[in-house]
Structures are given as structure tokens and as C-alpha cells.
UniProtKB/Swiss-Prot annotation:
Coiled coil: none annotated. Belongs to the RNA methyltransferase TrmD family. It catalyses: guanosine(37) in tRNA + S-adenosyl-L-methionine = N(1)-methylguanosine(37) in tRNA + S-adenosyl-L-homocysteine + H(+). Homodimer. This is tRNA (guanine-N(1)-)-methyltransferase. Its main location: cytoplasm. It comes from Fervidobacterium nodosum (strain ATCC 35602 / DSM 5306 / Rt17-B1). HAMAP family: TrmD. GO terms for molecular function: tRNA (guanine(37)-N1)-methyltransferase activity. Its EC number is 2.1.1.228. The gene is trmD. Specifically methylates guanosine-37 in various tRNAs.
Length: 246
């Protein structure tokens, strides 16, 4: 998969491909990340990418010409990409959106800045995506988040089992995790995790995953499609809750 990020601050976003599993994926040719500087597609000596808004109002608007020149270049060089604009007006990023984006051969993320982008640039945009109901100074951080989330669904970037166990993968939050030592400050690792009984461990993990989801994200719990393991885990959880309530 090829992911491109179009920004006026390339040094800001280049770190996304320099660390961790994404850097390994790039090194192993599982993922190609291209970072483009929008200023390289300007025609004036000052490389200006913004201008005053028609009709007045505060702030500046990103000019359309550099975008038109960029997409002419990109389409000739690589082929037409699936284009995402980072925007507080967009759909909120989630696992389903990330999985869909990971199936694209070429993904291009535009980092918005200033008051916004000239509306005529929207002819190139397939989808607007937000990472939450708040406003940032620019789209670089959301672009990095989108890149990170999408990359996890590319085969080989992380182990498939790790992805399946992530929070939200099946509309459930992740179960608790423990490592050594077995005891710290009187806090013990649950005995079931030391038992070696993989069936009981899986059941305990699912139970705790359901407990977390009910407590923290009941909206996800209500969307979840329950399997037989879920039903057994819920029965255990309800028994524990009834016992604790007495």
C-alpha cells in the first residue's frame, strides 16, 4: 500500500515513518509512505499557499492552484489515489473506516490548515475524516493518526492476532494485561493467567473485556455481535456482579 501525506510542514509528519512498527513496515516494503510539501507546487517565489477569503471574514484560506498542480503531478506519477481530507467536519475515525482505507492501493491524506481549503479543491476529495469533536491548528496530527491506524490493518505490519485483540476490533474494549513481577505492592496477577489453561484464560479475558466495555463504552456493548464464548463469559460476569452486590 502507498500512503501519501500532503502538508505544508513535511518535517512535522516525517517522523511517522521513522519509528516503531511503521518504520519496520516501510523497511520491509509492506508500506510506502510519501510526504509531499504543498509549497513545492506553488509558482511564486515566496511559495504562498494561502490568501484572503472572498466575502471577508477572519483567517486565511488555502489557495486552490497548488492542489490542482499537485494532483496533476500525483496522478501522472502514481495513478489516481483515494483522497482523504482531515477535517473537523468529517466522519469520526474508527476501526471500520480504517479497515476500509487499508484496502486502497493508494491513499492520499490532505492536511488542512488556516480557516480551511478553497471549496473547489473538494473535487479531488473522496472522504473527510475527523479524529474527534475538537479543532486542531492543522491536519498533520490527524494525518499521522490515520496513517498509524490504517497501517495496522495492512497484512504483515503487525501480527494478525494482535489486531484481533485490540480494543474496538469486535466492538469490545481490550482485556487487562499483566507482566512480571507476579506481585507488586500487594497487587497480584490473577491466578487464572498463571494456570496454563488456555480455554479458561480466553474465557477470563473475554469476561474482563465485556466488563470494561459495559462500564466504559455501553454504546459499543449494545452493537456487539455475541458468540458462544461471549455468552459463557457474560454468565460468569453476571454471577460475579450478583455475588459482589450481596
Amino acid at each position: 500500500m502507498r500512503i501519501g501525506i500532503l502538508t505544508i510542514f513535511p518535517d512535522f509528519v516525517k517522523v511517522i515513518k521513522e519509528y516503531g512498527v511503521i518504520a519496520q513496515a516501510v523497511e520491509n516494503n509492506l508500506l510506502q509512505i510519501d510526504i509531499f510539501n504543498l509549497r513545492d507546487f506553488t509558482t511564486d517565489k515566496h511559495k504562498v499557499v494561502d490568501d484572503y477569503a472572498y466575502g471577508g471574514g477572519p483567517g486565511m484560506v488555502m489557495k486552490p492552484e497548488p492542489f490542482f498542480k499537485f494532483f496533476e503531478y500525483y496522478n501522472q506519477m502514481f495513478g489516481k489515489p483515494y483522497v482523504v481530507l482531515t477535517s473537523p467536519q468529517g466522519k469520526t475515525l474508527n476501526n471500520e473506516i480504517a479497515k476500509k482505507l487499508s484496502a486502497q492501493e493508494r491513499l492520499l491524506i490532505i492536511c488542512g490548515r488556516y480557516e480551511g481549503i478553497d471549496e473547489r479543491v473538494m473535487k479531488f476529495v473522496d472522504e473527510e475524516i475527523s479524529i474527534g469533536d475538537y479543532v486542531l491548528t492543522g491536519g498533520e496530527l490527524p494525518a499521522m493518526v490515520i496513517t498509524d491506524v490504517v497501517s495496522r490493518f495492512i497484512p504483515g505490519v503487525v501480527e494478525e492476532e494482535s489486531v484481533k485483540n485490540d480494543s474496538f476490533y469486535n466492538d469490545l474494549l481490550d482485556h487487562p494485561h499483566y507482566t512480571r513481577p507476579r506481585n507488586i505492592d500487594g497487587l497480584e496477577v490473577p491466578e487464572v493467567l498463571l494456570s496454563g489453561n488456555h480455554e479458561e484464560i480466553e474465557l477470563w479475558r473475554r469476561k474482563e473485556s465485556l466488563r470494561k466495555t459495559i462500564s466504559k463504552r455501553p454504546d459499543l456493548f449494545l452493537k456487539h455481535q455475541f458468540d458462544e464464548v461471549d455468552k459463557k463469559a457474560l454468565l460468569l460476569l453476571f454471577k460475579e456482579l450478583i455475588k459482589d452486590a450481596k
